[in-house]
């Protein structure tokens, strides 16, 4: 089996589930009564965990201080409405490029949340040194991604970067479009079935992880996008950050026939 390496910064994803039944007497804000708290590794660690949930050969290079970087969401227990997100950030040390064992892996995935772990020059260097680099980045795209195999971005990221996406680069860009599915080379790949979205947190990581796994298994990008759509559609129907599972045979076969 092919080996996957994920590179990128990680954090702690914390969900604080609450009830809110009254406003504070001194301020026009709800009083939150905490019911439950959950912690999960996030960002690049979430990509790695999703890959490992369905594929055995994946390793991660990330920042050691990831537990000091947190995203805390205060969420209404019943409606799943997020009241507020509070971020606590620490300095992320830059990666040591000379230590990267890229040749040991068949696919290299860059999960870049633009926190300082990877610069544009670092990513460009990795792409120049390996033929199969998949990128998911929060940075505005530019010439530094020209040697990537695939760049996965969402609608918002596409709008910010479209001025820099040349016709040649466009051939390597996958745009995830939420409930519509994903677009690649002018073709829209719809989700296999309409679902009731409860929480889209981490859905991009899940899509990216499933894309990596299926491409490692098949080398077929069309097949990989359909598989990623099917996996991500199973994640968004659950609360919080959840791991992907192999989609049901029926749902996945339906997606392949679209």
Model-assigned labels for residue ranges:
Residues 113-119:
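Active-site glycine- and acidic-residue-rich loops that bind
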Residues 2-4, 12-109, 120-122, 245-258:
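Conserved N-terminal subdomain of the carbohydrate kinase-like
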Residues 5-7, 85, 107-110, 134, ...:
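Structural motif
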Residues 60-63, 134-137, 153:
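Short internal beta-strands
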Residues 75, 148-156:
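Non-cysteine beta-strand/loop elements that form the S-adenosyl-L-methionine
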Residues 9-10, 113, 206:
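Active-site metal-binding loops of divalent metal-dependent hydrolases
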Residues 104-107, 121-143, 147, 160-258:
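Conserved phosphate-binding/catalytic region of the ribokinase-like
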Residues 89, 113, 138-140, 156, ...:
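Active-site beta-loop-alpha junctions enriched in small/polar residues
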């Amino acid at each position: 089996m092919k080996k996957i390496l994920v590179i990128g910064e990680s954090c702690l994803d914390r969900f604080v589930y609450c009830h809110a039944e009254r406003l504070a007497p001194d301020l026009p804000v709800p009083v939150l009564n905490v019911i439950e708290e959950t912690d999960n590794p996030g960002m690049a660690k979430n990509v790695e965990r999703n890959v490992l949930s369905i594929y055995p050969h994946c390793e991660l290079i990330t920042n050691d201080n990831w537990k000091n970087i947190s995203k805390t969401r205060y969420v209404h227990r019943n409606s799943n409405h997020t009241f507020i997100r509070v971020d606590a950030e620490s300095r992320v040390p830059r990666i040591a490029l000379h230590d990267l064992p890229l040749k040991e892996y068949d696919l290299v995935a860059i999960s870049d949340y633009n926190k300082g772990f990877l610069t544009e020059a670092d990513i460009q260097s990795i792409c120049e040194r390996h033929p199969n680099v998949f990128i998911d980045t929060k940075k505005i795209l530019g010439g530094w991604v020209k040697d990537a195999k695939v760049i996965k971005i969402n609608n918002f990221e596409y709008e910010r970067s479209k001025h820099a996406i040349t016709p040649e680069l466009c051939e390597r860009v996958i745009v995830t479009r939420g409930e519509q599915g994903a677009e690649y080379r002018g073709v829209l790949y719809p989700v296999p079935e309409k679902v009731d979205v409860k929480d889209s947190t981490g859905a991009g990581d899940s899509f990216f992880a499933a894309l990596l796994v299926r491409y490692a298994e098949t080398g077929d990008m069309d097949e990989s996008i359909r598989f990623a759509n099917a996996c991500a559609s199973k994640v968004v129907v659950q609360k919080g950050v959840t791991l992907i599972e192999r989609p049901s045979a029926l749902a996945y076969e339906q997606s392949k026939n679209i």
